[in-house]
Amino acid sequence: MTDAPVSRIRNFCIIAHIDHGKSTLADRLLQDTGTVANRDMQEQFLDNMDLERERGITIKLQAARMNYTAADGEEYVLNLIDTPGHVDFSYEVSRSLQACEGALLVVDASQGVEAQTLANVYLALENDLEIIPVLNKIDLPGADPDRIKEEVEAIIGLDCSKAIPCSAKTGLGVPEILQAVVDRVPAPKDAVEEPTKALIFDSYYDPYRGVIVYFRVMSGRINCKDKVLLMASKKTYELDEIGIMAPDQKKVDELHAGEVGYLAASIKAVADARVGDTITLLNAPADEPLPGYTEAKPMVFCGLFPTEADQYPDLREALNKLQLSDAALQFEPETSSAMGFGFRCGFLGLLHMEIVQERLEREYDLDLIVTAPSVIYKVNMIDGTEVMVDNPATLPDPQKRESIEEPYVKMEIYAPNDYNGALMGLCQERRGEYLDMKYITTDRVTLIYELPLAEVVTDFFDQMKTRTQGYASMEYHLIGYRKNELVRLDVLINGERADPLTTIVHRDKAYNVGKALVEKLKELIPRQQFKIPLQASIGSRIIASTSISAIRKDVLAKCYGGDISRKKKLLKKQAKGKKRMKAMGKVDVPQEAFMAVLKLNDSP
């Protein structure tokens, strides 16, 4: 049993945009409270995936318990729950916020408020969290704390008179932050005697002990000898151990309301202990689960194929293992005439897709070909049924379908005023519908647009950063489906349809996209000994075509002068060979060609 009374527990998280110093601040808090000895300290202590350290982002949630002696001489338990800052992982963020009573809002004193910070702040306000503004990086020469305070007050409406200036790098202001957490974050509700409910805010897969679940006890208590029931998945488990993260796992006998801990119960896969599920006791279950549980739905799909056919079983095993620790990843087998066997995978967003792909290549040593990402389309058939299509190649024939609907998102882009025109141009190109424009401060603006998700998942983010020299940031959420004039654009290479290059585009853009695509492929596919026609088609109608000319071997090199009929015979023989080659020959399409769909920046 941990001995902290509920009144001396503080649960808080850190909200920050990528690169505003969240993980560094977490490091300093751990160091200042003596939770991690100075000699054990390494940068970004809570980001324990190599990929997280390299990209400087937090992907999986972590939690750490710190003991802190406050100014009043009492010892407090501070539970820091780390949150991912990226838009793809917003569901995980919302669950971790539910486990807290307060949040540190970290804003870079030289850059100001960014889109993802805002999205998370609104989530925190919905959960009634006490928000403490922290201005980080005040040791930088470009820092302007007064301007940033005004900005936070203008945009979020928070009172910044008590904002804490700090530098997580040097440790300046960290003791004040710890004291502010004790003074300003409310203690958890004292609900020890109520029926047991605990919220799962994260889980990860341990190859030896099964799934380790991180949870926050909302009411009641959990003992290490209890049998528990997970209310959403209806599964029951006998606990092997429970404990606290300090920040390494430490076993305890019991945890009560307000505390944060972990449990191990030989759970086979993360999908059995979903983030947001409610843990209760089997012999005295709660009447209803905690609110807000939803299953993470994939938004972006792509095909993953091994470059070598014999790696297919390895890819399947790697995906199975990854799914144990990533419940949002979905996959099913698919075959393609051009690529052989592979998998169709579903992801939360583009970043999630990149991370999964990188982990497969890095941790499982696989060489992969990845097709261009697509979204889920809703196809209304003539017979009145609805079909959901996540692979453009499987779109039903035009004769059978009545209309196609595509997902739309509402997007907010935050950027300096100077880049207004460039951003509006980009949104216009991507079939965006203008909703509103708000001036946050005299030189920063918010653009609000509605766009088709398909236009966002390709290279929208890269383009936005390029056109604004990296200053813009965006945040979007799904708002539903809308009917549009959409067609399937097929690419034929040497007369054969290349499934991975099939895309669904708006009818008005089809010709330009088709033309740009075949031109791009012409650059990327190496020349062969025979001529390769490249065509883009809608149904049976070819809308754009070009061809890669053959490499010609000079068969007349050995003929010095002499009879013309001899030369004709050799040329005829060569033409015959090329004809046979063209009929039999397979064209090797390099990986870059499959990503060509993404890089059609020159298409309007």
UniProtKB/Swiss-Prot annotation:
Its EC number is 3.6.5.n1. It comes from the Bacteria. GO terms for molecular function: GTP binding; GTPase activity; ribosome binding. It is found in: Cell inner membrane. SMART domains: EFG_C (SM00838). InterPro entries: EF-4 (IPR006297), EFG_III/V (IPR035647), EFG_V-like (IPR000640), EFTu-like_2 (IPR004161), G_TR_CS (IPR031157), GUFP (IPR027518), LepA_C_sf (IPR038363), LepA_CTD (IPR013842). This is Elongation factor 4. The gene is lepA.
